[in-house]
Each structure stands twice: as C-alpha cells, then as structure tokens.
C-alpha cells in the first residue's frame, strides 16, 4: 500500500506539468484580451496594443510557455494578479478560507443528512419514506441553486430578518443560507446514490442469507450491507469535495462571498492569466490529492481493491 | 469522524471570532457596489468597480465639480505656452500618514503612472519638472481641446513616501490625501473607510468629491442584482446605484426609501460595418426602422432618453440645437423607401454583435424584431466582455459582423466619446471601428478634437448623421435608490455615488 | 456468491435466444413507473419536434403591452420582459434544450462508460494513465474548456455538445471504475475469464450489468444541470443564440426578475424538472431491468 501511495505521489509531478502546459495552451488559444479589462472600456485600440506589448503578450508561444514553466516549477512563483496586484498564491489562500468553510459544512450536511435518507429509502423500498426521500432528491437535483438561494434570502433575510442577505461579515450566520442552498443538490444526489447502491446490495444473496440466518435488521444493515454499498458513495463524496474546493460560483455570486469560485471566474472573464493558471494548478493539486485519498479509502473499505493495488500479478 | 467534526468546529469558532462587532460611533453609511474594484492602488486602470471607490479613496490635481473644473490638490494653474503649464499646489497638504505633499510627489506620481501604463491618457505628458516645493511644470507632447483637464483629473496623487512604504504598491492599504482612509479591505467583499480627522483642506475650499459628511463609509460588493435589491430592502446597505430599473418602483414613494435619478454618461449606439454595408441609404434605412421608444421600454423599463448624437447631451461641447433636430426617429415610410433605394429585400440577413448584458440582449432582440417586420433577418452574436473587446478592435474579425451594438461615455467631452470609435488614428488598422476610411470624416473629427467650437462640432455631427456610419440609440439614466438615512444623494461627474458628499 | 455466478450464466444462456438487450427491454416494459417516464419523455419530444406548427404564438413576437404579463387565458404561462409568450417559448425551447441535454448526456455516458470499463477492467498502467489524464482535464474549469473548444474548433452544434459533455465524462469514469473495482475480482468474473469468454463479452455481459447502477443514477440526475449549463455557452460563441428560446437561457433571463415576476423562472424551471423526473423514473427502471440479481 505504501508503495502504491508513493508511486501515486510521484505521478503528481507529470500531472502538475500536464496541467500547467494544458492550461497555458488553453489560455493561449482562448481569444480575449487581458489588456482591455485592465485599461477599461475607454482605452483605444492603439493604447491596448501598447499595453499588450508591455505585458509580453505578443511573444511567441514557446517563449511564453518556457517563461511560465520556469517561473512556476523552478522559482515556485505563481506570479501576481493583473487585477488585484497581489500574489496569486496569497489571493487564492485568502479566498480559500471562505470556500473551505462552505465546502466542509456542505459535505458534512451531504454526508450526515443524505446518507441516512438514502438508507431509510432503501430499507423501505417503495414505501412512504422512499417516496418522500426520492421526491426530495428530485427537487434537489432539478431546482436551480440560485432559485433556492434567492427564495431562502427572501424568507429568512428580507421578510424575517433573522439572517443577513449576503456578505461574510456576520460570522457563522453569513454561512447558514449559502450552505443550505449549496448542499441541497448534494444531499439529494447523496441520498439517491446511497439508496441505489444499498438497494443493489440488499438484493444480494449474501444479505438474504444473513437475514435468513436470523441476524437482526440493524446488524445486517450496518455490518453487512452498508460497507459493500460504500464505493459509489465515496466516489461521490470525493468528487464533490474536489469540486467544492474549486468554489461554487453561483452561490458565491448570490451571497457575495469572496470565495475561490468567484476569484477564478472573474479571472477567467477578465483573462487574468496569472490567477487562472496559478489557480488551476493549485486546485488541480488539491483535486489530485483528494482523488488519491479516495483511492486509498477504497482500499480500506474493500480488501479486494487493496489487493488489486498491491499488484495483480501475485493474484492472477 | 471526531477529528473532522473538531476541525469544522474550530473553523466555525475562528470565523465567528473574526467577525468584528461593529462599533457604533458616529454616522456611518454602507454603499452597495456591483463591481469588484480589485486592486485599489493609485495607478491602476479604470476597470469596472474601481470607478465607484475612486473619489472616496483618492484626490487628484483637478476635479469636475458640477459643471466646472476646480483644483482639488491644485491651487493655481498657469499657462506658460501651448504645451507647458505650471501647477501650483496648496502648501498645506498632508496625507493620512502625515507626509507633506510637494511638487516632487506630483512628478513621482505622473512618472510612475505613465511607466505602469494603466492610464493610457498620460502618454501625452512628456515630463514633469519640479520648479519649487509647491510648483510643478508640466510639458505635454500634444494637447487637444479638453485634454488638459482630463489629464490633470486622470492621475490619483499620493506621496512618494507613503507609496514606497507600502508593501504591495497600495493594492490593499492606500495612504492618500483623501478625507477617508481605508481601515479594512476584505478583498472581494467589503472596503471600510474611516474619516481622517486631520484632513488637510479647509471646509470652505473643499470640492464636492472631497466632502466628508459621514464618519465611516463601507462599500459592500454585491454582484447579484436581485441580492442588491434584497440588501437594500433589508437595510443592510443604505444606498446603491446598481438597482435594476424594474425594481425601482419598490423603493419609489415607499416609506423609509427614496430614489434619485441622474443621467448616466454612457450612451448606446450602433456601428455599421462599412465593408458589408457600404451604402448610406441602407444604413439610414436600418436606423429609421428601429424604434428607440421600444428599446427604452424593453431594455430600460421606460427610463432613458433618445440619443441625439453618438453620446449624450450633457457634455459642454454638445450643441444645443441638436436637441430639436430630427435624429433617426422611427419612420416606417422612410425606412421602406430607403431599403428599396438600397435594393435590400426581404430575406437579407445582418449579423449583430454585442457585449452580453441584460440590457444589450434586450436592445439586440428589439432591433431583431424591428427589422423582422421588414422581412430582414438579424443573427445575434453575443460575446462576453473579454471576447467582445477582442472582436471589437480586431481587424481580422471584422468580416464576422455587420452591425455592432456598443456603448461609450466620457468624463468630460463629447469629442472623447466620438474618439472611442470614430477616430481612425486610434485604431491599429487606420480605419474607424466600423471600417470607414473616409478622409472627410477624419478631417472633421480631427478639427473637432483640436477645437471643439460649435461649428466644428456641428460639421462633424451633421456629416456623421448624413452618412450614418454610426448613430446613437439611448442615453441611460442611473437610479440611485437609498434609505432615508441618506437625505440627499450626491454623485460625481462619472455618475458614481459620493458617500462623503451625500447628506444625512 | 456462487449463486450469483449461476445467475449470470443463466443470463448468458437466455441471451443467446433473446439477446441481452431484448431481455432488458422486456423487463423494462413491465415496469409501470418507467413506462410513465418514457411516455412523458416521448410526449415532450413530440412537442419539441412539432413546436414550429403548434405553439400558440410566435416565440419571438415581442409586445410592449404584454411585458411581464401574468399567466392568463390568453397567455397560459404569462409573458416575459419582452412581452413574448412563455408557453410558446417553452414549447419551442424544448427543441434546443432536450436535444442538447439528451445528446450531451448520451455522449458523456458512452465515452465515460467505454473509458471506465477499460480502466476498471485492465487496471494497472491503463488505469493510472487514463485516470491521471482525467485528473488533468478535471483541473481545467469547464468554462475555459468550452471557450477553448469554441476558439479552436469554432461554433456549431457538434462542438456545443462536446463542450457540454466533456465535463460529465470524468465523473462517469470514476463512478464506473469504483464499482468495477469491487466486482472485478469476484468469482463469477474470474470464472467467466477461465472459460475463455472474450474480454468484450466479460465486460459487457458480466462486469457492466453489475456495476452500471451508479452511472445511471448520476447520469439521469445530471441532465438538469446540463440544460442549465447550455445557457452560459451562448456568450462564448457556442450554444443557442437569442431569440431562439432555450430553457436554461429563459431561466437566467428571468433570474433578475425572480422576486418581482416569478413566473418568468417558474415555468422553464418546471419544464426542466419534468425532464429530470421522467429520466429518473426511466433510469430507475432501466437500472432494475439491467440488474441480474433482480430476475422475475
């Protein structure tokens, strides 16, 4: 297992290089002019051309790529944002504090509300609990996040005045509505995946056997069924966590939270190359680490998978 | 799992601790801002968002106060010759850190700003010479009408000592001469200013942009338009210039709220691509076929007025008589006759390119529907901001559009609005944005830029109108909605809220 | 466990007569809920196809008098900010939204399942290389990928589908890979391999039916999001240009009016919900029909 993890960590190097080259190339072919968003709408074409020259945007692809890779991987410098004038790394970390809180709270909600809902639905297949749970799940995946968010604001902030409408200056209270609005879809999808894979397992012969042996419902459920149903759930949680740490633009926009998502989207829209490239690299690193973690958790949950990691030759 | 929970708890606690208990001392105001200013350093480009905090953060040599230009830091302006001016500063200016502002700081600011290249107008400043402690001599390379004022208004001024003491070129913590000092900047969220009790200027000499009627100002960045409305309704913000037109009625004549409407300096206009529509009759026909009243109704909820030229009618060099002229008012008969004259028949297709925004989409759709009445198809090509900027100026992309919906404004002169798209000297390919290479047009605009006398202005306006290379659609109106905490809303000449100058 | 193995063989035997596909369809037809879902989907598709002839109004016809008109007998769903009939726009918008939503979901699923089975079945180097490439692709924000696609390949319906589907592929691969990892070493798979079943056959008739369920769930739930996403593509040269209606764009146009004129958002929102609902009903049925453990 240690060897597997070590190997995967070594793989991060080519992955990071790959991300760097790909994102650089994408930014290179994407039309759009960073100079025009820097100088504002009243700059003329001649003035913009001069600014582009100064920013080194007219150099050939290979020169710029070399400069970028050298900066990033040899000097470990992600550069300075065009728009904010501050270091990309510092900017990203400042935004990350908000995104991290939201991501952790949302994942907690998703796991601790969604999973029990899904289990309840599966064990009462086609019963009332199942119907309610699935209806909620369908609502969850089909209600657009912005709609839910604005409705929550209207009720709890504008009409009742219990919570702030937006911003981050009210401590935990600022995060209640964003987290609810953001996690609804996650809870729904978690519940549905849990239900689906629990159903799958419950129908398996060994569960039938276990039940036939007279084991209590609870023991069967939690000792035998759940562990075997966990793989898709782990995948969903891992993927969801990775995505959420990249920020959720819709929620951040609606609630005026200066998180990673808004930072990156603004940067994409204004072609703030250092932020886009640095941000993608760091988020990619985090994402890869989470995916590694997911694979490790797989191995803990299912010994068969562990065996596959440790070399197929011995097994075959 | 326990570890995870404790991590969440720790985070939550850290956050609630960090949330500051707002000390209720003196009067304070919260302004809702739609755009994120980003870097608030002095020598940054005029991106959206920055303009909203500019005058609260900085002072310039000169400002436009109402309709007149007044010195802010500058006490006296003396002309030496056509391209040389002496600027005399007040001799008692100190910044928020107590540094004295002298002529060498002026030289420093203009040189740094010019080197940074974010304020392109400054390229016509050749050099700044320090004559004495409080007198700086400006040498310009060229000065068209109005250029002097816009140059002196363009560059924010700080002391060299304060600028060099800042770790990040004042990107987050500017120390300036303004009556308000940034005390807290949560990037992307809020900027809080406290009144500087030792503001240098005497009350009777203070220009509008530097008034300081309130103790604390907070700008809150709220990108979502519905949330801006909600925040105002919940009275979390006191004033905002970014309330969508259709929500204005929620605040107009409603207890506890008030609305002030002021003209915006931007105007929407259409640019025709000369390469694909070389026939003047065809361009005029399109102009006559579009009903601006429809546009105002659909895109601006009825709040806006007909443009009378490419630009609004509030500029000092706008010629009054244009207000009474016929200017492409909707005229079905004329449109039909002109389409016939140009040989345009049903089934013809135009490609309309625009910068995506709610109002632009609606304007474009209105134009599409209007031309649809003549059997003419319009393909809409919306682009996001960055892409539009590229397509607008890129010579190679000019084959991809026939009509462009654009907007422009200027802080001082109508000629500066015209210059944006109609002066071929400002394009990299020697034609206007609409690909017109018309020597007469060029000589007329150069004449108007050099001397914006009513005759020159009128000559250009009439020729442009006759050729219809471009024509103005609508001038926008800004809605300032505010709580009654603000008794009188004040704005700068750029249509932005001046929280310090509002009355409370 | 051995019982399962026998069950699989049973499926294998029957498939010789009827074909596995036919068998799945047979079971699907008996599932009422799934059939209801399918019928509504078919009705929606028919509406979409016939929409140019059956909408009550022209979807592009603006009217100053009807701006923001509330639902009434003239306009069942009301009118939008340009006075256009929302019902007509939803009916016509079904064309673009259903087409883009379904097509890109299908593309993402097919590609994802192909890659996922390869990765899950072969493991080792194949797994490592494909998954690392996915790590790289998933690190790039979707919006940027779409802009790059539009810039490099140009506009057009094919590229729009590519832009919409590319984001869904990694998730499908990961889900399938995870499930396959759990079944990969089960006895019945090894048994099938021992009796010299072709690899294709092992994957399609033994591994996939036992591991596809999470993919079906995720795909059927994702379509709502895909339809919403299509709206953002029209600003970067892909997708559908106004005034041609499309549900995602209708929602985002109505967004700023949501508290003032909620009907602008509610009806396109309901339309999307209906599609998600039907697909989920159908997906549940399909999953049950494909599950070898659930034989009648």
PLM features per residue range, with description:
Chain B
Residues 96, 139-156, 175-224, 248-266:
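Aromatic-rich, solvent-exposed beta-strand/loop patch
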Residues 379-388, 417-484:
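Extracytoplasmic/peripheral linker and loop segments enriched in polar/acidic and small residues
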Residues 32-80, 88, 111, 175:
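N-terminal lobe/hinge region of extracytoplasmic solute-binding protein
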Residues 34-52, 73, 99, 147-156, ...:
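A structural "hinge/loop" feature
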Residues 8, 304-341, 359-360:
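Structural transition elements
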Residues 31, 372-424, 455-456:
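Periplasmic binding protein-like
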Residues 78, 82, 120-163, 168-169, ...:
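Surface-exposed binding/hinge segments that line
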Residues 277-316, 362-363, 461-474:
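Periplasmic-binding protein-like
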């Amino acid at each position: 297992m240690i060897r597997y993890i070590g190997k995967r960590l070594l793989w991060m190097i080519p992955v990071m290089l790959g991300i760097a080259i790909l994102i650089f190339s994408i930014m290179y072919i994407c039309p759009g002019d960073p100079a025009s968003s820097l100088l504002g709408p009243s700059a003329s074409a001649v003035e913009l051309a001069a600014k582009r020259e100064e920013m080194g945007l007219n150099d050939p692809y290979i020169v710029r790529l070399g400069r970028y890779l050298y900066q990033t991987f040899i000097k470990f410098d992600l550069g300075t944002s065009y728009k904010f004038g501050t270091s990309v790394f510092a900017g990203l970390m400042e935004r990350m504090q908000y995104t991290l809180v939201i991501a952790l709270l949302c994942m907690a909600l998703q796991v601790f509300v969604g999973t029990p809902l899904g289990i309840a639905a599966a064990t009462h297949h086609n019963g009332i609990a199942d119907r309610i749970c699935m209806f909620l799940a369908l609502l969850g995946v089909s209600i657009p996040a912005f709609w839910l968010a604005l409705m929550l604001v209207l009720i709890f902030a504008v009409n009742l005045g219990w919570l702030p409408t937006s911003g981050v200056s009210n401590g935990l209270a600022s995060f209640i509505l964003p987290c609810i609005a953001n996690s609804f879809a996650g809870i729904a999808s978690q519940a549905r995946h849990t239900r689906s894979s629990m159903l799958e397992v419950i129908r398996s012969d060994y569960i039938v056997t276990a039940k036939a042996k007279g084991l209590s419902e609870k023991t069967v459920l939690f000792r035998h069924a759940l562990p075997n149903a966990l793989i898709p759930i782990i995948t969903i949680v891992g993927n969801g966590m990775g995505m959420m740490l990249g920020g959720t633009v819709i929620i951040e926009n609606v609630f005026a939270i200066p998180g990673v998502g808004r930072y990156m989207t603004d940067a994409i829209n204004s072609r703030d190359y250092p932020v886009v490239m640095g941000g993608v690299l760091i988020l990619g690193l985090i994402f890869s680490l989470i995916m590694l973690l997911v694979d490790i958790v797989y191995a803990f949950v299912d010994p068969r998978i562990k065996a596959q990691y440790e070399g197929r030759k011995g097994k075959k | 799992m326990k570890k995870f929970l404790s991590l969440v708890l720790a985070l939550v606690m850290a956050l609630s601790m960090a949330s500051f208990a707002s000390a209720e001392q003196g009067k304070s105001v919260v302004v809702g801002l739609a755009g994120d200013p980003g870097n608030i350093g002095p020598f940054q480009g005029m991106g959206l968002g920055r303009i909203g905090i500019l005058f609260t953060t900085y002072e310039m040599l000169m400002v436009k106060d109402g309709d007149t230009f007044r010195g802010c830091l500058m006490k006296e302006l003396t002309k030496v010759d056509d391209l040389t001016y002496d600027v005399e500063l007040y001799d008692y200016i100190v910044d928020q850190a107590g540094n004295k502002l002298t002529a060498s700081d002026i030289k420093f600011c203009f040189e740094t700003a010019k080197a940074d290249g974010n304020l392109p107008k400054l390229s016509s400043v050749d050099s700044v010479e320090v004559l004495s402690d409080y007198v700086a001599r400006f040498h310009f390379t060229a000065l068209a009408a109005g250029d002097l004022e816009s140059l002196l208004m363009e560059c924010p001024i700080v002391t060299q000592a304060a600028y060099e003491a800042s770790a990040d070129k004042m990107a987050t913590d500017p120390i300036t001469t303004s009556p308000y000092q940034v005390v807290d900047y949560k990037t992307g969220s809020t900027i809080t200013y406290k009144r500087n009790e030792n503001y240098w200027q005497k009350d009777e000499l203070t220009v509008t942009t530097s008034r300081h009627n309130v103790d604390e100002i907070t700008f809150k960045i709220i990108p979502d338009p519905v949330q801006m409305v909600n925040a105002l309704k919940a009275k979390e913000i006191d004033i905002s210039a970014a309330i969508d037109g259709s929500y204005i009625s929620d605040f107009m004549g409603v207890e506890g709220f008030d609305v002030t409407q002021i003209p915006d300096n931007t105007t929407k206009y259409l640019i025709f691509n000369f390469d694909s529509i070389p026939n003047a009759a065809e361009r005029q026909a399109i102009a006559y076929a579009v009903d601006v009243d429809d546009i105002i109704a659909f895109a601006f909820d009825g709040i806006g007025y007909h443009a009378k030229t490419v630009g609004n009618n509030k500029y000092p060099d706008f010629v009054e008589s244009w207000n009474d002229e016929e200017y492409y008012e909707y005229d079905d008969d004329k449109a039909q006759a002109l389409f016939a004259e140009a040989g345009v028949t049903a089934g013809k297709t135009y490609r309309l390119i625009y910068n995506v925004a709610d109002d632009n989409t609606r304007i474009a759709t209105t134009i599409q529907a209007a031309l649809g009445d003549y059997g003419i198809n319009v393909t809409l090509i919306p682009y996001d901001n960055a892409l539009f900027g590229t397509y607008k100026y890129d010579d190679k992309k000019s084959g991809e559009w026939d009509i462009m919906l654009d907007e422009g404004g200027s802080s001082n002169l109508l000629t500066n609005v015209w210059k944006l798209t109609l002066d071929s000297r400002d394009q990299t390919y020697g034609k206007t944005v609409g690909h017109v290479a018309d020597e007469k047009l060029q000589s007329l605009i150069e004449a108007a830029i050099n001397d914006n006398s009513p005759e020159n202005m009128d000559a250009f306006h009439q020729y442009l109108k006759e050729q219809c290379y471009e024509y103005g659609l609508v001038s926008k109106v800004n809605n300032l909605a505010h709580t009654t905490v603000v008794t009188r809303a004040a704005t700068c000449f750029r249509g932005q809220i001046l929280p310090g100058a509002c009355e409370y | 466990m051995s019982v399962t193995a026998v069950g699989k063989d049973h499926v294998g035997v029957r498939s010789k007569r009827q074909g596995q596909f036919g068998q799945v369809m047979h079971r699907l037809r008996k599932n009422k809920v799934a059939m209801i879902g399918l019928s509504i989907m078919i009705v929606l598709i028919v509406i979409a196809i016939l929409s140019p002839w059956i909408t009550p109004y022209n979807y592009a016809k603006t009217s100053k008098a009807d701006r923001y008109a509330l639902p009434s007998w003239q306009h069942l769903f009301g009118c939008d900010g340009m006075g256009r009939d929302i019902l007509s726009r939803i009916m016509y918008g079904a064309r673009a939204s259903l087409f883009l939503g379904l097509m890109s979901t299908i593309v993402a699923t097919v590609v994802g399942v192909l890659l996922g089975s390869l990765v899950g079945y072969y493991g080792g180097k194949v797994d490592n290389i494909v998954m690392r490439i996915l790590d790289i692709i998933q690190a790039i924000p979707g919006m940027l990928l779409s802009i790059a696609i539009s810039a490099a390949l140009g506009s057009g319906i094919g590229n729009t589908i590519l832009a919409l589907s590319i984001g869904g592929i990694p998730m499908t691969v990961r889900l399938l890979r995870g499930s396959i990892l759990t079944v990969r070493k089960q006895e019945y798979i090894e048994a099938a391999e021992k009796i010299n079943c072709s690899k294709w056959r092992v994957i399609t008739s033994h591994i996939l039916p036992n591991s596809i369920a999470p993919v079906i769930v995720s795909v059927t739930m994702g379509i709502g999001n895909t339809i919403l996403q299509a709206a953002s593509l029209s600003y970067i040269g892909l997708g559908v240009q106004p005034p041609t209606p499309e549900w995602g764009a209708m929602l985002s146009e109505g967004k700023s009016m949501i508290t003032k004129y909620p009907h602008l958002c509610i009806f396109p929102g309901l339309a999307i919900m209906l599609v998600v609902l039907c697909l989920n009903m159908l997906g549940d049925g399909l999953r049950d029909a494909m599950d070898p453990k659930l034989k009648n």
